[in-house]
Regions:
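Short, contiguous acidic/charged loop-to-helix segments that flank catalytic cores in large enzymes
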Residues: 23-24, 62, 133-135
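Short, flexible, glycine/charge-rich loop motifs used to bind or transfer phosphoryl groups or to couple energy/partner
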Residues: 1, 36, 146
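Single conserved hydrophobic/aromatic residue that forms the stacking wall/gate
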Residues: 1-7, 12
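Catalytic cores of secreted or luminal carbohydrate-active enzymes
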Residues: 32-121
Length: 186
């Protein structure tokens, strides 16, 4: 991405789509998405999330229109200065207190939405660093995550996988970016 930035030119790209891939070969996709998200720290960059339009067995999503529309939103906001919600929610901060974590996001538009039922794809880990499914619910403009067994939370992940079953969106129908608070490489 750095190499495409010359002067004040804008670089807008999509983020790696959901994909199962081959075991042992494509297991680093969450880490690649994480690095892609960090690239937003580079000036004159914007990104559209394609996680929810991917195909389980094809890295190239057939739904190109949705990806294109999301890239266009990013261009309208970043290049043309339109005041609109152009990105899905991005984790800003996590407050952990005992067996509960409150996750705060940027880019929520008018609020957060759980598409197709209760929130999914949230995991928590304690001192043992073993991630387990967690209960999550929208709490105002944040998400509250709780460990199912009441154990203390040390770390939180969302949609951390090659083809996660994630469903957190903002009011503009844009999906939340996967994230993790840990630095465990698995």
């Amino acid at each position: 991405i750095r190499s495409c930035l010359v002067g004040s030119e804008m670089c807008i790209r999509d983020r790696l789509a959901g994909f199962n891939g081959k075991p042992g070969v494509h297991e680093n996709y969450p880490h690649i998405r994480e690095v892609q998200l960090k690239a937003l720290d580079i000036p004159n960059t914007a990104m559209a999330l394609a996680l929810d339009v991917g195909e389980a067995n094809d890295i190239h999503p057939k739904n190109k229109k949705t990806v294109g529309e999301r890239l266009a939103l990013a261009a309208r906001a970043s290049v043309y200065g339109e005041q609109l919600c152009y990105s899905g929610p991005i984790m800003r901060e996590v407050d952990i207190q005992g067996s509960t974590a409150i996750i705060h996001f940027d880019h929520i538009g008018d609020g957060l939405v759980a598409k197709d039922g209760a929130l999914r794809a949230f995991q928590v880990a304690g001192q043992d660093a073993e991630f387990k499914t967690a209960k999550a619910s929208i709490l105002g403009h944040s998400v509250q995550v709780e460990s199912l067994d009441g154990s203390l939370i040390k770390e939180v992940r969302y949609a951390w996988g090659g083809y996660p079953d994630s469903n957190l969106y903002n009011s503009a129908a844009l999906p939340a970016a996967p994230f993790r608070t840990d630095k465990i490489n698995r």
